[in-house]
């Protein structure tokens, strides 16, 4: 069952990443598609450290790199490092008390910090407010799609 849900989640993230090619935005919130990886990162962190999820996140990150014309490995690095930081945070905070939106808000904050550090380190232009709004829109959509991604160690 968990493998089927991993496959469905992978297809959803890969398909919504294709929406990067269309200039579709939600008003001031911008487009959530570049950080659609956040849904998988947050939902799949319930499995704990897992080679399958890390591999899927790596390849989804490469897929987003190709679609957004980013330097190859940028989104893969962001996805894997956000996933690792989310796992560590979930271990110390516990995800049960946070709920669906709380856990993705923590993951989104971690992703924002990693993206900021990565962009500053690379010395590239970085629209901070736009990135915050993009992550906020992905967090808002997670309320509707999160149940597809949420997995636990019991499902393995």
Residue ranges and their predicted role:
Residues 1-156:
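Terminal, non-globular segments
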């Amino acid at each position: 069952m968990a493998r089927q849900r991993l496959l469905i989640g992978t297809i959803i993230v890969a398909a919504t990443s294709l929406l990067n090619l269309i200039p579709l935005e939600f008003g001031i919130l911008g487009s959530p598609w570049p950080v659609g990886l956040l849904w998988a990162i947050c939902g799949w962190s319930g499995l704990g450290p897992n080679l399958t999820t890390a591999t899927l996140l790596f390849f989804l990150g490469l897929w987003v790199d190709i679609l957004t014309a980013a330097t190859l490995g940028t989104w893969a690095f962001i996805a894997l490092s956000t996933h690792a930081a989310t796992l560590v945070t979930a271990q110390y905070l516990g995800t049960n008390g946070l709920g669906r939106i709380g856990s993705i808000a923590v993951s989104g904050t971690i992703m924002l910090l990693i993206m900021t550090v990565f962009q500053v380190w690379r010395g590239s232009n970085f629209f901070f407010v736009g990135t915050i709004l993009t992550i906020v829109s992905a967090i808002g959509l997670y309320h509707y799609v999160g149940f597809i991604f949420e997995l636990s160690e019991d499902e393995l």
